[in-house]
Design a protein with these regions (language model features):
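Short glycine/threonine-rich loop-to-helix capping motif typified by GTGT followed
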Residues: 22-27, 159-162, 202-206
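Intrinsic disorder and flexible/low-complexity segments
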Residues: 1, 123, 194-215
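Beta-strand segments within the central parallel beta-sheet cores of soluble alpha/beta enzyme folds
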Residues: 13-14, 46, 146-149, 190-191
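Conserved beta-strand termini and adjacent loop/short-helix elements that scaffold enzyme active sites
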Residues: 44, 97-99, 191-195
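Cleft-lining beta-strand/loop regions that shape enzyme active-site pockets
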Residues: 1-86
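Charged, glycine-interspersed solvent-exposed loop segments at helix/strand-loop junctions
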Residues: 12, 84, 88-163, 167-169, ...
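C-terminal intrinsically disordered, low-complexity extensions immediately downstream
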Residues: 174-206
Length: 215
């Protein structure tokens, strides 16, 4: 919506996230890449912009961070829960029927075999390579340069400026002013996206609502 609205001349993306799902990060990165071809995008980092939070920041036209922002964490990990020992300890016997051996690879009721472990590791490494390549492209660095400061390392905002992951130290107001300069406008007003049609009580949730979490 912000990309196609001709009245919007520049976008400031406020990021306050320690990371998240790899696919979601890639989808947001792609939207930023498409939008950047039409209008400038400036990132303003809050307390966190790490892992997936940095993934979606790396291709912006300019990146601002606070001195103590936690950023970087260019790395990938996967979690495969296994309940084998738990069910054995509780005396629960689980029988599975599947079409072939590979169909049960993601089962939480069987140990992780070496073949599937190697397959999973290969997938994680591919995602990491994509992550590093995105950062290298967005920050005008080589793969080796990004990998040297990547591998899951976290950096403060001030350190991130020194190593090239962030452009400037500054807050949201600084990012807004810079975006206005890029768009070559002096008088402007801001609009928040997405716009939520909920009140404060709805955001807090009712007593009956259950907590939902994701990675």
């Amino acid at each position: 919506e912000a990309r196609t609205d001709e009245n919007i001349k520049a976008i400031v993306l406020r990021i306050d996230s320690p990371g998240g799902n790899a696919l979601t990060s890639e989808l947001i990165w792609r939207e930023i890449e498409l939008t950047k071809k039409i209008k400038p995008i400036v990132v303003s980092m809050g307390n966190y912009a790490a892992s997936g939070g940095y993934y979606i920041a790396c291709n912006a036209n300019k990146i601002f961070a606070e001195e103590n922002t936690i950023t970087g964490s260019i790395g990938v990990f996967g979690i495969l829960p296994n309940f084998t020992q738990l069910t054995t300890k509780m005396g629960i016997n689980v029988e599975q029927v599947n079409t072939n051996k590979n169909a049960a690879d993601y089962s939480v009721f069987r140990p992780l075999d070496e073949n599937f472990r190697a397959f999973t590791l290969e997938g994680v490494e591919k995602i990491y390579n994509t992550f590093v390549n995105h950062v290298a492209s967005g920050r005008k660095m080589t793969y080796a340069q990004v990998d040297a400061i990547g591998q899951g390392r976290v950096w403060s905002g001030s350190d991130a400026v020194k190593i090239g992951l962030v452009d400037k130290i500054g807050g949201l107001d600084d990012a807004l002013k810079y975006a206005a300069d890029l768009a070559k406008i002096k008088d402007y007003k801001t609009q928040n996206f997405p716009e939520y049609n909920k009140n404060f009580k709805d955001l807090l949730g009712s007593k009956e609502r259950k907590l939902k979490t994701n990675f």
